[in-house]
Curated annotation (Swiss-Prot):
InterPro entries: Ribo_uL30_ferredoxin-like_sf, Ribosomal_uL30, Ribosomal_uL30_arc, Ribosomal_uL30_CS, Ribosomal_uL30_euk_arc, Ribosomal_uL30_ferredoxin-like. Residues 114-146 are annotated as: Disordered. Gene3D superfamilies: 1.10.15.30, Ribosomal protein L30, ferredoxin-like fold domain. This is Large ribosomal subunit protein uL30. This is one of 5 proteins that mediate the attachment of the 5S rRNA onto the large ribosomal subunit, stabilizing the orientation of adjacent RNA domains. Belongs to the universal ribosomal protein uL30 family. One of its GO terms (molecular function) is rRNA binding. GO terms for cellular component: cytosolic large ribosomal subunit. Residues 123-144 have a biased composition (Basic and acidic residues). The gene is rpl30. The keyword Ribonucleoprotein applies. It comes from Haloarcula marismortui (strain ATCC 43049 / DSM 3752 / JCM 8966 / VKM B-1809).
Amino acid sequence: MHALVQLRGEVNMHTDIQDTLEMLNIHHVNHCTLVPETDAYRGMVAKVNDFVAFGEPSQETLETVLATRAEPLEGDADVDDEWVAEHTDYDDISGLAFALLSEETTLREQGLSPTLRLHPPRGGHDGVKHPVKEGGQLGKHDTEGIDDLLEAMR
């Protein structure tokens, strides 16, 4: 399971890349979604590589992001352990995070919005014009790199 975060805006973005981002449920800058590691999604991620940061997050970071930024599909309730136990198939947020990482379920299947609306990164980006290899934020991150980004945007 990969976490995708849109870092660059839609100005001068080709329409097929905009369409791909919408298919991935990312509609604005600083929005995040979780996608499985299948060939279809791998191709979509490769297409939007220059506009997003992505990588496989750790369970602890995913728990933090879900606790602070997850929203129900309907209503405006806070998502906490009680809400998860009452409305999903899991007992708490850590169980849900483990199931998401092992690709047993999706956010939408559990009644949560597939888009996580994140805060801009505290301390700023390392650079949204360059890939990770050049010292920027764009492209594929290792687990530690995507964890740092998601933690800054929690």
